[in-house]
């Protein structure tokens, strides 16, 4: 991971520093010379100003540059319409129309129309229209239109339109339109439009539009897909995989289909269900169903758990031709009869919504005869609904 961070950092450094060759050459020229300090620098471009050829060995309290400025460092304020280049440290305010480049530490506020690039740490605020780049630690805030990058840790806030990257630990908040990456532990919140990723641990919350990935999570994950080795809270999403969590394969029956297969994954506090069912009949067509659900399973005793589940399944006769949705709320008991084997059973209340314009729906009850106690036809969209009490029972392996 450290090698990858160094490679990425090197690539970004070259890409983000159009005058890097210039600054490195000048730094070599001045590295053995003693720096001096002045209260004020006024320049048009590097070396064409009040400090002249001594620009690279002079730190300025104030520096005002018509197009661009170059100095050993800034102590209070630096401004330029295009760019500022500091060989060493910069504080407390640095403003540029295009980019700021600092070879040392930054303390205070650094704002640029396109990019900020620092070769050491920053303590304060960085704001750039496109990218903030630093090879040192960040303590404070980074705001960028596209990306924030640091090869070290972040303690504070990263907000980017596309990507945030912290090579080491994150303590605070990462918010990005597409992705957040932290190479070390995360203590706080990651929120992204697509993906949050850390190969280490999270103490807090990950929220993503598609994927959250972490090792050990002491908190929660909220996303379409979630992955963690272990998690103390609830992974909420379409599909959550917790390596040391709750995984079961179920063979069961209900009042509609005698054979159902279901897979549960997540944690007992919150899990997802994927299932299919079939009615084994010798006919010209097959009655089958597929569906999805969510549930929770609190412990009742040493070997007994409660199941509270909500699910929906599409019941079909051959191909999927029309809406025929069975929505089920189930409350049952799960009893551990052996290691990794459990029996379950319980009642359910069912709400069917179906398309009345289609007349080839399969019969609901072939092997049992529940009584439908409520039927209703809707005036719009050729829809109707039914209510009835049912059951579920079977065996689970995990």
What function would you assign to each model-found segment?
Residues 1-27:
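Bacterial Sec-dependent N-terminal signal peptides
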Residues 58-60, 216-218, 253-259, 268, ...:
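Residues that define the transmembrane beta-barrel architecture of outer-membrane proteins
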Residues 64, 113, 129, 145, ...:
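Membrane-embedded beta-strand positions of outer-membrane beta-barrel proteins
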Residues 64, 222-224, 238, 259-265, ...:
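Residues on the lipid-exposed face of transmembrane beta-strands in outer-membrane beta-barrel proteins
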Residues 66-70, 83-85, 99-101, 115-117, ...:
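Transmembrane beta-strands of outer-membrane beta-barrel pores
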Residues 105-107, 121-123, 137-139, 154, ...:
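Repeated loop/turn-to-beta-strand initiation elements of outer-membrane beta-barrel proteins
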Residues 229-232, 268, 334-398:
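Predominantly the C-terminal beta-signal and adjacent terminal strand-loop region
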Residues 233, 283-285, 317-320, 354-358:
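Outer-membrane beta-barrel proteins
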């Amino acid at each position: 991971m450290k090698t990858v961070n160094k490679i990425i950092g090197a690539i970004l450094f070259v890409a983000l520093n159009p005058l890097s060759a210039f600054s490195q050459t000048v730094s070599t020229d001045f590295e053995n010379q003693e720096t001096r300090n002045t209260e004020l620098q006024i320049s048009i471009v590097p070396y064409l100003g009040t400090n002249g050829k001594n620009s690279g060995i002079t730190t300025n309290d104030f520096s005002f540059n018509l197009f661009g400025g170059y100095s050993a460092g800034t102590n209070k304020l630096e401004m330029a319409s295009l760019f500022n280049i500091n060989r060493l440290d910069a504080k407390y305010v640095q403003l540029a129309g295009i980019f700021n480049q600092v070879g040392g530490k930054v303390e205070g506020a650094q704002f640029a129309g396109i990019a900020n690039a620092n070769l050491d740490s920053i303590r304060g605020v960085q704001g750039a229209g496109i990218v903030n780049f630093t090879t040192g630690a960040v303590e404070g805030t980074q705001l960028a239109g596209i990306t924030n990058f640091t090869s070290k840790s972040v303690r504070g806030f990263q907000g980017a339109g596309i990507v945030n990257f912290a090579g080491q630990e994150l303590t605070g908040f990462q918010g990005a339109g597409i992705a957040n990456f932290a190479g070390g532990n995360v203590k706080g919140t990651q929120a992204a439009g697509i993906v949050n990723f850390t190969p280490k641990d999270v103490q807090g919350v990950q929220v993503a539009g598609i994927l959250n990935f972490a090792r050990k999570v002491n908190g929660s994950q909220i996303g379409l897909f979630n992955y963690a080795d272990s998690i103390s809270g609830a992974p909420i999403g379409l599909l959550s995989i917790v390596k040391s969590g709750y995984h079961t394969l179920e063979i069961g029956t209900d009042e509609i289909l005698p054979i159902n297969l279901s897979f549960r994954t997540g944690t007992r506090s919150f899990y997802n269900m994927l299932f299919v069912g079939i009615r084994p009949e010798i006919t010209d067509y097959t009655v089958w169903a597929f569906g999805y659900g969510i549930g929770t399973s609190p412990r009742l005793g040493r070997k007994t758990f409660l199941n509270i589940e909500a699910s929906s399944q599409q019941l079909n006769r051959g191909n999927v031709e029309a809406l025929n949705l069975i929505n089920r709320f189930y409350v049952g008991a799960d009893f551990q009869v052996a290691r990794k084997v459990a029996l379950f059973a319980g009642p359910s209340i069912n709400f069917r919504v179906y398309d009345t314009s289609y007349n080839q729906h399969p019969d609901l009850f072939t092997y049992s005869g529940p009584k439908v106690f409520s039927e209703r036809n809707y005036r719009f969209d050729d829809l109707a609904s039914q209510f009835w009490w049912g059951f579920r029972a079977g065996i689970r392996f995990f």
